[in-house]
């Protein structure tokens, strides 16, 4: 298994961190990329920094490293997740503005008909946001707002994070054991 995980500047950095951890724990290669804004938000929201992302990923890239292998369709991977995904990044992907590695890799993922999961972290959404997300869904992306699942009777924020990350991994095609409805 080989995945690309991108972190953008939206709130919810811990979801991206935990997804990288989970995928690597399950034996996957994880190629991580973080935007400049993600690095700022990561420090604001967590005790982690860019160095930790470099440590847990198989390979790490900055958003301006456009020559990264996954910027090309010839690089085979099993899917890409943008977690968290800002509206700015979603808009760039939706309209083909591949001006950084994250948008380029997502564009390539879509054109190669691979799984692209976007964990949109914005609320409320105006009609322009919704049209952009609908466009992405029509292009084949999975729009995955990290909505909290209370049917699991979480005892902590970590329980909520774990459940959400497990569901994102599942959208990438990874078999994950987690508590489901019913």
Curated annotation (Swiss-Prot):
Binding site for FMN: 9-11, 35, 86-89, 121
Function: Flavin prenyltransferase that catalyzes the synthesis of the prenylated FMN cofactor (prenyl-FMN) for 4-hydroxy-3-polyprenylbenzoic acid decarboxylase UbiD. The prenyltransferase is metal-independent and links a dimethylallyl moiety from dimethylallyl monophosphate (DMAP) to the flavin N5 and C6 atoms of FMN.
Disulfide bonds: none
Protein name per its UniProtKB record: Flavin prenyltransferase UbiX
Keywords associated with the record: Flavoprotein, FMN, Prenyltransferase, Transferase
Amino-acid positions noted as binding dimethylallyl phosphate in the UniProt annotation, renumbered to this chain: 151, 167
Catalysed reaction, written as an equation: dimethylallyl phosphate + FMNH2 = prenylated FMNH2 + phosphate
GO molecular function terms attached to this record: carboxy-lyase activity; flavin prenyltransferase activity
Lineage summary: Archaea, Methanobacteriati, Methanobacteriota, Archaeoglobi, Archaeoglobales
Highest rank taxon of the organism: Archaea
Family statement: Belongs to the UbiX/PAD1 family.
EC nos: 2.5.1.129
Xref: PANTHER family: FLAVIN PRENYLTRANSFERASE, FLAVIN PRENYLTRANSFERASE PAD1, MITOCHONDRIAL
Coiled coil keyword on record: no
SUPFAM superfamilies given in the database record: Homo-oligomeric flavin-containing Cys decarboxylases, HFCD
